[in-house]
A protein has these predicted regions:
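Flavin-dependent oxidoreductase catalytic cores
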Residues: 1-372
Length: 372
C-alpha cells in the first residue's frame, strides 16, 4: 500500500475502550493494543480518536484534537512498530451520537470514572436525535461550523503523522457524523449539503480530502463506511458510488461495515452469520475497483483465507474475536498448516511453546492447545 508494507493481511479493528482521560493515551492503551502486536497482527488500529472534544462518543475516548496528545500516541506507535506491526489510527467525529454513556452502561448511568461529568451539546447535519439513549436533538451545523470541522480532520491527520502512525482511517460509519450526512434519514438539510446523494456526500468528501491533503503521500489512508444504514436510507449502490469518489480523492482502502445510524448497534438489522458483512466488501471492491477490508464474525484462519482467495476483500479485520484471542494470527497460521513449530511467534514465546508441545498428546501438538 503506497510506501507501506504490512507483514500479513490481518488487522485489529478499532474498538473503543473508554479508558482515556482528556483524550490521552495511557498505560492501559499500550497494554491493550500491544498484545495484538505480540500476537502478530499485521496492522493494529487504535480506537476512534476524536478530532475535537465535542466529537467524542464518551468522555473516555482517545483524542487527536490537541498537540499535547501526540507524545502518548508516540509511545504506542513505537511499541507496535518495534514488535513488527503497522501502527494505525482512526479519527472521527461522533456528531449527534456524542456525549453518551459507555455502551455497557445504562442510559444516563455514569460511574465513578465519570467524575461528575455531564452531557455536552451535540451537533449533526439536522436537528434529529439518534434515539433515546443519546442526547436531545442536536444543533444543526451551519456551513462555517462544518468548514471548521473539516479543518479539524486535517489537523488530526497532521498530528497522527507526527505521532508516527503508518496508516490513518476516517470513521465514516456506524451513525457518526459523516454517516449522518450521508443518510437521508438523518440529513434533512435543504442546502448544498443535503438533498440528493451528491449533496449528502459533499461534507464527508470534504473531510476525506482534508485528511488526504494533510497525510503524507507515501502513507495509506482508509475509510470505514456503513454499506447500508439499516433503515433503508443508504444502500450498497450508494456506497459503491461513494467509493468511486473516495478513490478519486486518494483513499486506498474501504473498510466495509454496516448499520449504526440509530441505537447501539454497529451493524444493520440483517441476519447475523459467519462473515455476514463480507458481501458488502466484495460489492464495493468489484463495483468501485478499490481494495476493501472485510469485517464481521470472521472467526478462524480457513474462513479468513477463503475471503481472500475468493477475491472478496484484501484485508481481514478482526474485532471481538481478537479480544477473545489476541494471538489470532499465529493461531490462524497453525490452522492453515503454515506454522508447525511456533516459528511465527516471538521467540520469547515460541521457543518455550515449541518445547511444550513435546509434552502434549499428538492431537494437540500441532497447535499446543491445552486439553479442555
Amino acid at each position: 500500500m503506497r510506501g507501506v508494507t504490512a507483514p500479513n493481511r490481518t488487522v485489529v479493528s478499532p474498538m473503543v475502550q473508554y479508558r482515556a482521560t482528556d483524550g490521552l493515551v495511557n498505560d492501559y492503551h499500550i497494554v491493550h493494543l500491544g498484545k495484538f502486536a505480540l500476537g502478530k497482527f499485521g496492522i493494529v488500529f487504535t480506537e476512534n480518536c476524536a478530532v475535537e472534544p465535542r466529537g467524542r462518543v464518551t468522555q473516555g475516548d482517545l483524542g487527536m484534537w490537541d498537540d499535547g496528545q501526540i507524545e502518548g500516541h508516540k509511545r504506542l506507535t513505537r511499541f507496535l512498530q518495534r514488535e513488527g506491526s503497522l501502527a494505525a489510527t482512526q479519527i472521527t467525529h461522533a456528531g449527534r451520537k456524542a456525549s453518551s454513556p459507555r455502551q455497557f452502561d445504562k442510559p444516563d448511568e455514569f460511574g465513578p470514572r465519570d467524575g461528575g461529568w455531564q452531557r455536552w451539546q451535540v451537533v449533526g447535519p439536522s436537528a434529529l436525535s439518534a434515539g433515546e439513549r443519546y442526547s436531545e436533538s442536536p444543533l444543526a451545523l451551519d456551513v462555517p461550523e462544518m468548514e471548521a470541522i473539516v479543518k479539524k480532520f486535517g489537523e488530526a491527520a497532521r498530528r497522527a503523522d507526527a505521532a508516527g502512525y503508518d496508516i490513518i482511517e476516517i470513521h465514516g460509519a456506524h451513525g457518526y457524523l459523516l454517516a449522518q450526512f450521508l443518510s437521508p434519514l438523518s440529513n434533512k438539510r435543504n442546502d448544498a449539503y443535503g438533498g440528493d446523494r451528491a449533496g449528502r456526500m459533499k461534507f464527508p468528501l470534504a473531510a476525506a480530502q482534508a485528511v488526504r491533503e494533510n497525510w503524507p503521500e507515501h502513507k495509506p489512508m482508509f475509510i470505514r463506511v456503513s454499506a447500508v444504514d439499516g433503515g433503508g436510507g443508504w444502500d450498497v449502490d450508494d456506497t459503491v458510488a461513494y467509493a468511486h469518489e473516495l478513490k478519486a480523492l486518494g483513499i486506498d482502502v474501504v473498510d466495509t461495515s454496516s448499520g449504526g445510524l440509530t441505537g447501539l448497534s454497529t451493524a444493520a438489522p440483517i441476519k447475523r452469520a459467519l462473515g455476514f458483512q463480507v458481501p458488502f466488501a466484495a460489492a464495493v471492491k468489484r463495483g468501485a475497483g478499490i481494495p476493501t477490508m472485510a469485517v464481521g464474525l470472521i472467526l478462524d484462519g480457513p474462513q479468513a483465507e477463503k475471503v481472500l482467495q475468493d477475491g472478496d476483500a484484501d484485508l481481514i479485520a478482526i474485532g471481538r474475536q481478537a479480544l477473545y484471542d489476541p494471538f489470532w494470527p499465529v493461531h490462524a497460521a497453525q490452522e492453515l498448516g503454515c506454522d508447525t513449530d511456533f516459528g511465527m511467534w516471538n521467540p520469547e514465546y515460541g521457543w518455550w511453546l515449541d518445547k511444550r508441545k513435546n509434552n502434549l498428546p499428538a492431537d494437540r501438538a500441532a497447535t499446543g492447545q491445552a486439553i479442555k
